[in-house]
Amino acid sequence: VIDDLKKVAKKVRRELLCKKHHKKLN
């Protein structure tokens, strides 16, 4: 279960970073 949470956290972090990056590009 902990591994799944870690995977989800990584996905969320990546999505947040992508959103921030897109804002910078735009």
Swiss-Prot record:
One of its GO terms (biological process) is defense response to bacterium. This is Guentherin. Antimicrobial peptide. Active against the Gram-positive bacteria S.aureus FDA209P (MIC=35.5 ug/ml) and B.subtilis ATCC 6633 (MIC>64 ug/ml), but not active against the Gram-negative bacterium E.coli or the fungus C.albicans. Expressed by the skin glands. Keywords: Amphibian defense peptide, Antibiotic, Antimicrobial, Secreted. The keyword Protein biosynthesis does not apply. The keyword Secreted applies. It is found in: Secreted. GO terms for cellular component: extracellular region.
